[in-house]
């Protein structure tokens, strides 16, 4: 028997006055959302094109299988029902929006405005439209590559909105590793649970950068195994397929079992 397709709700051309851009938003709803009158935790993920549908992915056919993975884990009772909000990038403005500072060679630097869009425009809309648990303990933010970079930047500079951050294969290299300085000067330390990972086949520099990020977080007061999870994935590449392969582990860390 063919498995039922995940339940997705679409909000085409969602407009941001802050960024002066429109983008598609896709919302995953857990099984029984329509009949179980309860509220749900929410995970916001960047690069929404790559999450749910292979035909929309940046590399055709390569997507994270977010809906299928969630359905499998929820139905099996391994995690509670949760919602996911996929936020499309805008293509040519992706670097602008996913970077915290302007790099002398590559430009960028609108990550703060992108964070405002998420917090002041998108999240209030989602909380009005769906049955969410809106507090930080039930609200997570995540992404990969530059999406991982901007996730950490937003979480550190706009505390009290997101309680957990998923930072996959982060672009620590951006603007001479400026994110490390942000970590070191963030005081007081926000109440955040942080996942950081890197694949061993993403390059020696990327792996070294991830280890520097872990060290900076530990130095700033996070504790590995408590509110910081750090993982290196043997043979993991910088690709949608690699992130899809460990997305189930991310969900288990976020929602399954002890909160570590």
Regions found by a protein language model. Give the residues of each.
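Non-catalytic cap/lid and distal C-terminal segments of serine-dependent acyl enzymes
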Residues: 1-260
């Amino acid at each position: 028997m063919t498995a039922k397709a995940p339940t997705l709700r679409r909000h085409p051309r969602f407009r941001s006055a802050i960024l002066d851009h429109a983008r598609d938003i896709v919302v995953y709803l857990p099984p029984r959302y329509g009949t179980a009158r309860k509220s749900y935790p929410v995970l916001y993920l960047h690069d929404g094109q790559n999450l749910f549908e292979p035909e929309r992915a940046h590399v055709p056919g390569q997507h994270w299988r977010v809906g299928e993975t969630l359905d499998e884990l929820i139905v099996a009772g391994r995690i509670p029902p949760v919602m996911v909000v996929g936020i499309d990038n805008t293509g040519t403005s992706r670097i602008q929006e996913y970077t915290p500072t302007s790099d002398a060679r590559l430009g960028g630097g609108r990550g703060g405005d992108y964070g405002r869009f998420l917090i002041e425009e998108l999240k209030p809309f989602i909380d009005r439209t769906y049955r969410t648990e809106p507090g930080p303990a039930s609200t997570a933010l995540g992404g990969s590559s530059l999406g991982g970079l901007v996730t950490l930047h937003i979480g550190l500079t706009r505390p009290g909105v997101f309680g957990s951050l998923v930072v996959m294969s982060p672009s620590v290299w951006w603007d001479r590793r400026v994110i490390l300085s942000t970590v070191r000067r963030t005081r007081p330390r926000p109440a955040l649970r942080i996942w950081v990972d890197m694949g061993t086949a993403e390059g020696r520099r990327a792996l070294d950068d991830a280890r520097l990020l872990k060290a900076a977080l530990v130095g700033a007061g996070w504790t590995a195994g408590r509110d910081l999870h750090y993982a290196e994935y043997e043979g993991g590449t910088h690709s949608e397929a690699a992130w899809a392969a460990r997305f189930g582990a991310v969900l288990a860390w976020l929602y399954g079992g002890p909160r570590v």
